[in-house]
Amino acid sequence: GKIINKTVYLCVGLKQNGLKEVLGMWVGKSESSSFWMGVLTDLKARGVQDILITCTDNLNGFTDTIRTVFPQSSTQICVVHQIRNSCKYVVYKDKKEFTADMKNIYNAPNKEVAAAELNNLERKWGGKYPYAILSWRNNWDDLTVFFQFPLEIRK
C-alpha cells in the first residue's frame, strides 16, 4: 500500500440554539478562492440561505468569495491565525510574554477595550516588533467583527 496525505476541509455551522452542526467535508489539494467558491455554492445549493458570520484564516481571496456567495455575511479573521502570524515576528524568549499581552486584546469585553489593549501592546512591543503590531492594525476591522455579537457566539 501507499500512504498519501490528503487535506479535508470542514464547515461547521452554529445554530441559533448554540448547537454545532457539520455542514460538509471536502477533500482539496489546496485552499484557493476557486476551491472555496465551489464549497460555498455547494452549501447554498443544499439549502444554506444565510450565514451570520464566518471565521476564516484570511486566505487571499477567501473573504471576497464569501461576500460573493453570501453578501450579507460578516467575516471575522480567526484570532488563532492572527496570533500565529504575529508570533512569526517575535523571538523565542519574548513569545510567552508577547502572547500573554495579545490575550488582553482578544479577551477584552468589547471593541473599545480591545483597542486600548492593542495600544498597550504597541507601546510595550512596537519598537521591537513593529510588523507584529502592524499585522493587527492592518486587519483590525476584520479581527473585531465578533464584538458585535453576544459572548455565546464569540466562544
Could you tell me what each predicted segment is?
Residues W26-K29, L52, T56, K88, ...:
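Hydrophobic alpha-helical scaffolding
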Residues I53-N60, T65-K103:
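Conserved beta-strand -> loop -> alpha-helix junction used to position metal-binding or nucleic-acid-contacting
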Residues T7, L52, Q76, A132-L134, ...:
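Structural beta-strand/beta-sheet cores of well-ordered domains, especially the beta-sheet scaffolds
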Residues K2, V12, E21, M25, ...:
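Flexible, active-site-adjacent loop/turn segments at secondary-structure boundaries
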Residues G1-C55, N60, D64-Q72, N139-D142:
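RNase H-like nuclease fold core
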Residues A108-K155:
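Acidic/histidine-rich catalytic cores and adjacent linkers
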